[in-house]
Amino acid sequence: MTAPPAAPARASVLALLAFLAFVSLGLPDGLLGVAWPSMRGDFGVPLDALGVLAATQTAGYLTASFLSGRLLRVMPIGTVLALSTLAAAAALLGFAAAPAWPALLGFAVLAGLGGGAVDAGLNAYGARHFSARILNWLHACFGVGTTLGPLIVTAVLGAGQGWRWSYVLVGTAQLGLALTFFLTRRRWAGSASAGAAPAPDPARTRDTLRRPVVWLGMLTFFVYTGVEVVAAQWSYSLMTLERGVPPAQAGLAVSLYWGSLMAGRILFGTVAHRVPLVATLRACLVTSVVGALLFWLEPTPSLAVAGLMLIGGALAPVFASLVSLTPGRVGGAHADSAIGFQVAAAGLGGAALTALVGVLSRWGGLEVIGLSVTVLAALLLALYEGFVRVGGEGVGPGQATTGPLGATQVPDRGAG
């Protein structure tokens, strides 16, 4: 049966809206690393309190991500996007107005709830309805946000304004996005193509959690996000406070890191359907270890920055590609919950490992940051190999059919 003519146009509109949602997710992450030295001075907290702030935000993020499977069963994805983006906007404006450290932590919980619902919901939706190409471009849009974030803070500080104005700007933009998602929320209903296989009944949460491949996937995402976030959030402090890099140059270096993530995802999206995915991801993870070594050992300042960019470029396709393979590894009945668990584990890894590196740097000096990134990158490579061994390669040739925007439709492996 031929799909209605409106179906491709609707799918394209939904992809565009998903791209906008991921830009909005990336903006706050890009702000924090550069704004933090100024923020901690205003609130009178030590440098490693960044880990406390990240952990607090992750409490909300984990709650929303872990419960995303249940949330999507009772609330349409369009409504989830509208409400969660509104919550994130309110949190960012709260950051700008926070009079004291406890208030900032409260707004961090709200920011986590909003971001976690958008992240897990769109990843679960995208794994079913978007191709690996679109998923990589989706995560590239996160990179657009994280690349713009440091530039916004650097420009605001360079203009002699306080860091709070950068949060006002981004929070106001997110209010506009929340309105857009509210007005278009009904477009997400019934978006599957006419020829797509019906989704299996979702498995019980405890049945999904009984699968070893789900736990190994969660651990892989935990460490992956640890590498990405530690490199992003601590590199500015290392360069400015330990290595004597001027603030403007260090801010540019962080933007280049996020930019390499964005560019890598855009590039990989154009070739994702033509390369052997497992071998390509393995090569990317090996390259990330090389980049981490350059950043840590700093043969020259330029090579250290190049290493930071190499980490970003090499990690670029990993998250989205692993998400796209999840339905094939765990089965359609387990996919939504498994992806929610993976996103939750990713959020926990970003917060917990950022906090751990902060404590270690306070004890052993800021150069511990480069060593930590290197060790985590090597651990990620080892975990990936274990994930492939236990879970297989996901959907192989001949196992899949095509859905909206080239989405992979996988056979169900059972709900038990």
Which residues fall in each region the model found?
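Extracytoplasmic gate region of multi-pass secondary transporters
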Residues: L32-G33, R211-S255, G259-A263
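Helix-breaking motifs and short loop linkers at transmembrane-helix boundaries and internal kinks
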Residues: G44, P76, A97-P99, G244, ...
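Conserved MFS/SLC helix-loop-helix module at the cytosolic interface between two early adjacent transmembrane helices
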Residues: T63-P102
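Helix-to-loop junctions at the C-terminal end of transmembrane segments
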Residues: A64-I77, G264-P276, S361
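Cytoplasmic helix-loop-helix junction between adjacent transmembrane helices
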Residues: F107-F142
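Helix-loop-helix hairpin linking two adjacent transmembrane segments in secondary transporters
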Residues: L138-A189
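C-terminal transmembrane helical hairpin of 12-TM major facilitator-type secondary transporters
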Residues: V275-L322
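A late C-terminal transmembrane helix in Major Facilitator Superfamily
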Residues: G332-L366, V373
